[in-house]
UniProtKB/Swiss-Prot annotation:
HAMAP family: GyrA. It is found in: Cytoplasm. This is DNA gyrase subunit A. A type II topoisomerase that negatively supercoils closed circular double-stranded (ds) DNA in an ATP-dependent manner to modulate DNA topology and maintain chromosomes in an underwound state. Negative supercoiling favors strand separation, and DNA replication, transcription, recombination and repair, all of which involve strand separation. Also able to catalyze the interconversion of other topological isomers of dsDNA rings, including catenanes and knotted rings. Type II topoisomerases break and join 2 DNA strands simultaneously in an ATP-dependent manner. It comes from Lawsonia intracellularis (strain PHE/MN1-00). It catalyses: ATP-dependent breakage, passage and rejoining of double-stranded DNA. Its EC number is 5.6.2.2.
Length: 820
């Protein structure tokens, strides 16, 4: 037997097969039809329910029964896909106007899964019945099902503009659709407008259709994005949830979320808020709980006392899905091809569909009426000659003979003759004759009406208008999504925070807080100001900066990294509060701590930072290099092995730099000796250290600063103040001069600071004791001296740190504030 071989190109075959697959997905699965707004699975579900009699007037049926009929007769796919579609059609948070009425667990807005289909029951909603109205009147075409055993409708003869009413979303091959739901009343008004004026501009329709109307409510911001979506088919709109502010006892307030954006999982939103609170990205929330019930959504966010609720609301919109973007892509199947639609074209295609349905329905009704009228004419004619008809029938030997004789004698059609033969004897009464004549006149009136519809376009559109008006009056519900006619701009949190003067304090143990400066100013009028300078008995303030809320706060660590945040992001604390550990605000590595904090309002090329390291390196860099930062921090200075950053200061060319070492040496040089270098540079040598020595302090002496002396303190409690004039200016990189006579008795130098006579000194020991004294109690001495004993230490104890404060210190420590 001969065989015929056909050689085909694999490239052509793959192109052909992929195109067929793509069209199958587009037309048969993922993209809705512009006429009824349904995908095949939804259309088959509704038709199967129609065939089962599962209407809104009858008791619901098990979902398993519906799903079984759909996959067995029309939709040869998995049962889960059909059940998921059926469930979604019953969810009032997924569909603007649900097409199913469900009984049982059909899932929730929290993302809970529905119960198994064997437990749930469903029936079509009253609105869904309008999708199938007149389907038995040849209004739409049918096609064979997948095994040619039954027929299914290609499209439903819906009276409802479902494509825009409930919207649709789906992903096909190389394309996707995402159409938002709308308000039925607005859609019907737009349809009526197009019926009255087919050439109406789209802009006029936009005055009728105000925007999407989501089942979950919320706010929608109408701007260019929505205009593009309605006029071009693609655009993006901003959607926000709706919140309220409630007053609580003792002046506290709560934020209550009542509506959320469409498609958002409520439990995921609550979880996201909780995560942000734990990560301290949103501060000021005391409690968070979900009080939602069958009456609606209610997520309560209790605020701490004194927190401005508008700030938290803005943070929720900024950091959580409470504000989302809805991308509109109005793609639908038109004449078996995907097409991008405008709002007007979508409505026009629906009206064209309604016109075709009404024309086909009218023709069906006309044919039916004419057929019935034809029979009635024959029956009435027979009644006019009833005696002759009866005799003719009685004299005939068979029904077939009687039919032929009736046709020949009275010029009847076969249908008329058969109707006469089928007529019951009771029809021979006079009353029945009157009924037949009355029915004939009614049919003649209907036929005239049907013919007028088919013959007059105005009458046809009048019928469509009446049906649209009826749907509007029957099913319209109030708008749920509030439209705000303005483009949403991202409001920064700073816009809601006043740029007040504040104080940032960082303790030696790493606790940081932000306090309003007015509290310290009030305290100086009679309170114990020093109470605001330490966080606990074993800690004291290391950094104290007066700044404003809107400035940038730069935190430099010993490992040479910089973290950047806004001042207002530092948690606020009272004057006596301990504060928040810095590790809870910025990520720190093991054995890493913040050594210096600076604040700047802008990162100018003319502003410079000076960096000093433990190994005597110094670097001057432009502040503009540090304008950007990352979540994990930014490399601020390149450190060599076993080196660490000890201080960063803002400097000018006129400043002088003093480096002090642990072995008691110091060097003073001009800032101009340190050239401007890049962010990752290690710097240049500031002082040549002797073996085993290290830098413990870096002082910036401003040209006009009134600090006549340098206070130097050792770890065994000795200290002295020395006039700045005794430190001559040297060349950078030298070994320096003696600053402090280090002996076994004094121990090593732990630090040095510029002071004046009206300053006070605060020392912290290893046994957690804090000692305070006035600077003028420490006698002035030369450079090559060891000073005096500042504190008597217990055996094994040592001084771990010290700082200076403005104001003398008496027994009550009144009026003392940290030296800035």
């Amino acid at each position: 037997m001969s065989q015929t071989e056909h050689h085909i190109s694999i490239e052509q075959e793959m192109r052909k097969s992929y195109l067929e697959y793509s069209l199958s997905v587009i037309i048969g699965r993922a993209i809705p039809d512009v006429r009824d707004g349904l995908k095949p699975v939804h259309r088959r579900i509704l038709f199967a329910q129609q065939e089962l009699g599962n209407s809104y007037t009858r008791p619901p049926k098990k979902c398993a029964r519906i799903v079984g009929d759909v996959i067995g007769k029309y939709h040869p796919h998995g049962d889960s896909a059909v059940y998921d579609a059926l469930v979604r059609m019953a969810q009032d948070f997924s569909m603007r106007d649900p097409l199913e009425e469900g009984q049982g667990n059909f899932g929730s807005i929290d993302g809970d899964a529905p119960a198994a289909m064997r437990y749930t029951e469903v029936r079509m909603s009253r609105l869904a019945s309008e999708f199938l109205s007149d389907i038995d009147k040849e209004t739409v075409d049918f096609r064979p099902n997948y095994d040619n055993s039954l027929e299914e409708p290609i499209v439903l003869p819906t009276k409802v503009p479902n494509l825009l009413l409930n919207g649709s979303s789906g992903i096909a091959v190389g394309m996707a659709t995402n159409i938002p739901p709308h308000n039925l009343g607005e859609l019907c008004n737009a349809l009526l407008k197009i019926i009255d004026d087919p050439d109406v501009p789209i802009d006029n329709l936009l005055n009728i259709i105000h925007g999407p109307d989501f089942p979950t409510g919320g706010f929608i911001y109408v701007g260019q994005g929505l205009y593009d979506a309605y006029t071009k088919g693609r655009g993006t709109v901003k959607v926000r949830g709706k919140v309220e502010i409630e007053e609580r006892k003792k002046g506290a307030q709560s934020i209550v979320i009542r509506e959320i954006p469409f498609g958002l999982n409520k439990s995921s939103l609550v979880e996201k808020i909780a995560i942000l609170v734990n990560e301290r990205k949103i501060d000021g929330i005391a409690d968070l709980r979900d009080e939602s019930d069958r009456k609606g959504i209610r997520v309560v966010i209790e605020l701490k006392k004194g927190v401005i609720p508008e700030i938290i609301i803005n943070a929720l919109y900024k950091f959580t899905p409470l504000e989302t973007s809805f991308g509109i892509n109005m793609l639908a199947v038109v004449d078996n091809r995907p097409q991008l639609l405008t709002i007007k074209s979508a409505l026009t295609y629906f009206l064209d569909h309604r016109r075709e349905v009404i024309v086909r329905r009218t023709r069906f009704e006309l044919n039916k009426a004419e057929a019935r009228l034809h029979i009635l004419i024959g029956l009435i004619h027979a009644l006019d000659h009833i005696d002759e008809v009866v005799n003719l029938i009685r004299s005939s030997s068979t029904p077939a003979e009687a039919k032929i004789r009736l046709i020949e004698r009275f010029s009847l059609s076969e249908i008329q003759a058969q109707s006469i033969l089928d007529m019951r004897l009771q029809r021979l009464t006079g009353l029945e004759r009157e009924k037949l004549e009355e029915e004939m006149h009614e049919l003649q009136t209907k036929i005239a009406w049907y013919e007028s519809i088919l013959g007059d376009t105005k009458i046809l559109w009048g019928v469509i208008r009446d049906e649209v008006t009826g749907i509007k009056e029957m099913y319209t519900t109030p708008r749920r999504t509030e439209v705000i006619r303005e483009t949403l701009t991202n409001i920064e949190i700073e816009d809601l925070i006043p740029d007040d003067d504040v104080v940032i304090t960082l303790s030696r143990r790493g606790y940081i807080k932000r306090t309003n400066l007015a509290i310290y100013q009030q305290q100086r009028r009679g309170g114990k100001g020093v109470a605001g300078l330490h966080t606990s008995e074993d800690d004291f303030v290391q950094e104290f900066i007066t700044t404003t809320n809107h400035q940038f706060l730069l935190l430099f660590t010993n490992k040479g990294r910089m973290h950047q945040l806004k001042v207002h992001q530092v948690p606020e604390g009272s004057r006596t509060a301990k504060g928040t550990h810095i590790a809870n605000i910025v990520p720190l590595e093991k054995e890493e701590w913040v050594t210096t904090i600076l604040t700047v309002r802008e990162f100018s090329d003319n502003k410079f930072f000076l960096f000093a390291t433990r190994k005597g390196m110094v670097k001057r860099s432009s502040a503009s290099y540090y304008a950007r930062s990352r979540r994990t921090g930014l490399l601020a200075v390149g450190l060599r092995e076993d080196d660490e950053l000890i201080m960063v200061k803002e400097v000018t060319n006129n400043d002088f730099i003093v480096l002090a070492t642990a072995e008691g040496f110091a060097i003073r040089f001009s800032c101009e000796d340190v050239r401007n270098m890049g962010r990752g540079a290690a710097g240049v040598k500031g002082i040549a250290l002797r073996p085993g020595d290290s830098v413990v302090a870096c002082l910036i002496l401003q040209e006009k600063q009134d600090t006549p002396a340098i206070m130097t303190v050792s770890n065994l409690g000795y200290g002295k103040r020395t006039s700045i004039d005794l430190y001559r200016v040297q060349t950078r990189g030298g070994k320096g001069i003696i600053n402090f006579k280090v002996t076994q008795k004094t121990g090593l130098v732990i630090g040095a600071k510029p002071v004046s006579d009206d300053n006070a000194l605060v020392l912290l020991t290893s046994t957690n004791k804090i000692i305070r004294m006035s600077v003028d109690e420490v006698r002035s001495a030369g450079r090559a001296t060891m000073g005096v004993r500042l504190v008597k230490l217990d055996d094994g104890a040592y001084v771990v740190g010290f700082d200076t404060v403005d104001g003398t210190v008496d027994d009550s420590c009144d009026d003392a504030t940290i030296n800035t």
